[in-house]
Amino acid sequence: DDAASDNHFIVESQEKIIYLTLQVRSSSLPTTICCTEALLRNNPKAPFSMLRLLLLSAICTAIPVNAAIRRTSLSGVSRSTTPHRSTKEFGRKKRMLRLSKFTTTATAGFTESSYDDDNGYKKASERRFGDSDWPQYGTKYLPKQTIERAERGNKIEKLKLEKCGSAAFEEVHEFAAAIREGTTTWEDLDIDDADVRLKWAGLFHRRKRTPGRFMMRLKVPNGLLTSDHMRFFADTVGIYPADVGVIDITTRQNIQLRGIELQDMTELIDGLQMRGLSNVQSGMDNVRNLVGSPIAGIDPEELVDTRDIAKDIDAMITNDGKGNPKLANLPRKFNIAVSGSRDDFAHTSINDIGLRPCPNKESGEMGFNVIVGGYFSIKRVMESIPMDIWIKAEDAARFCEAVLLYFRDNGSRGDRQKARLIWLIEDMGMEGFRQAISDKYDEMFPKKKGGAAIPAQPEPWAVAAGTNTPTQPHKKRDILGVHSQKQEGLSWVGINVPAGRILPDEAMALADIADKYSQGEIRLTVEQNVIFPNVNNTKVSELLQEPLFNIGHYFIPKTDKDFPLSRGLVSCTGSQFCGVALIETKNRAIELSKRLEEELKVDMPVRIHWTGCPNSCGQAQVADIGLMGGPARVEKEIDGKVKKVAVEGVNIFLGGKVGEDPFLGEVYKKGVPADYKYLIPIMKDILKEKFGAMEK
């Protein structure tokens, strides 16, 4: 174990900080040589760092290191992370050399943070308002008439006027330092700072469920990760109690880290930046994670590779992950998705802006037809509607910026239930909105004039060639399991992650598997699952035998009939951590699907989504069967009398569909008690009647 353990060193020079991970093995000289070569390539001005690296490598070759990694927080409290289960149970594999700050992972379409030779490297925690990255707070960018409407607006608008949420970009580090120094506690923070404004820094205080602990929501454009990211996530949450320190994959191809304490945020945020990830503008009135195709660049049926497009849009929104005050004071949250194929793996139909690939009928150039206005809320759910605009792929970020700035300045600052983009569109009418966006685009990008005025293009696959006959509907593909890529000799392997919940030891095991089979690349899906791309076909059978996928939790379906209910399972956080949720979801969802699979024979995949409340973070309306937390009552004998008492319950939705011809499901039954003795019989009846299930 000692020989296989990792050692983490910080090699400092006058200009750079390079995070290195070296394998401690008796044959570490080749590793040292490779490390030195990489260091010189990326840092030719730092020979002293090279010499220190050689010295450190020589030392670690001679001296075994304990398998437990000692991690010291910035508060000076030494915390020990014991070996994760993956070290012994899953078998720790040899890790790739990681130059976390400088490595470019080309296969992932991911470039980690680069060093600016002119200006020097600046940590996230070193940025200040008034600098070039943040010239002024977000409120300062609002036009006078927008501020006047905000002054008459809802309580959140007044809170933002009192102090802009973008202030949290900087203040999160001030709060963390004060807590580390013992000059304050989280309880002493202004409640609006702790529970609202810190969301601009991606921090969600779970006051109701886990007081003093935060969830951090990241920005992971297109769901692209590396093994180094996954290990960093595991190390981050692994120091906290097992019941709170977990990793969740979200329905936006994103990551949420749970159980984090505020004093540790600076270390975490700087570590994210060093790895090319960001936490800024992931909550409240900001644009959420950019969603794209999880099989971009490897899909045989791909129309557009969404990776660079999603990253470009995200870079525009977040100022390359540093934080962008200019777009940090929207009237409400905003979602953008970019589809790469007819399957629409990004679910564009439920986003404020959806980009759906389509060639220009005259030039043949591939671009996007734009749909707008999709969203879920307590009071209303809405599918996106056509905007009748086609844009070039190269103009996607520009178009999104024009829409966002127009929405920022003109969207409602009153009733927050009527502040999403669709309400502005309906107030203006689609023709008026379309013209306003075209004018805004031309004003912002005069050299691209007319780029947002091209009418939507006909989809060539909508009718059979040379006829007016509609083609057969395109069935959305299931990307779990093993699938051939467009690159000869390679496959992607889709892994089911039950309800999207990952424990630290599991994250370590996933990272090791990625290093062994997919060049360290990991991708996330909106169904809360994981994709390993670029797996050599000669290695697929070996991957399928990995212990992680054969212990009854994670699984890789081998046929369309394997795990018919578990494979499509999606769940929000539920009441375990979310104070808004009415019911517990994740554990209940996993258990119910397993019980139903044990008792029923189901010959087709059935997508089941759980969401804890009407906000529908679990997207119950797009599922074959959706279960939404709600009130229910059961009869119970109390003091000799039968009375109806309130219990956790669900409203059941049926008929949702995603893909080329999406449809939102409708309520089938309300007020069903969530207890299995009530829920299982009803679910069985639905599966038998609607999906042909039979008792085993």
Residue ranges and their predicted role:
Residues 21-22, 26-40, 44-89:
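N-terminal chloroplast transit peptides
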Residues 2-10:
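Extreme N-terminal basic, low-complexity initiation segments
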Residues 109-696:
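Peripheral terminal and linker regions in Fe-S/redox and tRNA-modifying enzymes
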Residues 14-16, 23:
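Charged/polar low-complexity intrinsically disordered segments
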Residues 1, 30-31, 56, 457, ...:
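Secretory pathway export signals and precursors
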Residues 65, 104-106:
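Cleavable N-terminal signal peptides
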